Every structure is written in structure tokens, then in C-alpha cells.
Amino acid sequence: MKRTLMQVYIKGSAEAVGVYQRAFNAPLVAGYKNDDGTYMHAEIDVDGQILAVSEEFQSGNAGNKMQFCLHYKNDEKDKVTKAYNVLIEGAQKIYDPLGPCSYSPHMAAFVDKFGIFWCIFSD
């Protein structure tokens, strides 16, 4: 296998790519746009892991059947905090605000404004 990646289909892909780049300090490594400026396919590098974003052209329920879980090392709590602060802007639902839980001293779970369910935490 050459690689695996996380792929999401959402409305507002161009805005989402910018938000996710800010949240994770992630460079755009591939981007193919549709005529309307949305992304047919975009890839950003989130600490060596690829997050792919494409425009959703059919209605769906993104965020309610799967979750992106990003597990950071103990010395990367600042990355968790930064991502949380960017991604909760306009969030649809915050399940667990940033704080301690049974498996992490620094965790948050929420659905962002694009309908993506995230769990981000550190050791």
C-alpha cells in the first residue's frame, strides 16, 4: 500500500480547506478546483497525515457516522489547543469542550461548521 488518507465531502470546500490549513498549520499539497472555485479534490498535510477535502454535490449527513480522531503526543498540547480554537468557530455542536477526560488531560470533541465530527487530544 502506498498510503492512506482521510477524505471528506462537504459543502464549502474552498472555505474548509483554508480553515483546516489554519487549524493544523497544514500546507496544501494538492489542489484541483472545479469551475466554481470549489475543490474537486484537495489534500493538506496534517503532521504527516493527509486530509483530503472535496465538494459535496449531493445532500448528505456528514459528521454523524464517523469521526476524525487526531491523537497528539504530550508535548504537542499547543497543537490541540490551536486546532480547537480555530475549528470551534461556528461549530454546530460541542460535545466535550477542551479539557481533561478519562483518557487524556487535553481533549475536545465537536462538530465543526462544515458538519465534520472531530476528536482531538494529547497524551
Where are these regions (language model features)?
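Short solvent-exposed loop/turn micro-motifs enriched in small/polar/acidic residues
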Residues: 1, 35-37, 101-103
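N-terminal beta-strand motif that seeds the catalytic metal site of vicinal oxygen chelate
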Residues: 1-18, 27-32, 67-70, 93, ...
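Short loop/turn microsegments at loop-to-beta-strand junctions
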Residues: 4, 39-40, 105-107
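Terminal peptide-recognition signature
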Residues: 6, 20, 44, 87, ...
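Vicinal oxygen chelate
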Residues: 10-14, 68-113
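Conserved short beta-strand elements that form part of the metal-binding/catalytic scaffold
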Residues: 31-65, 118-121
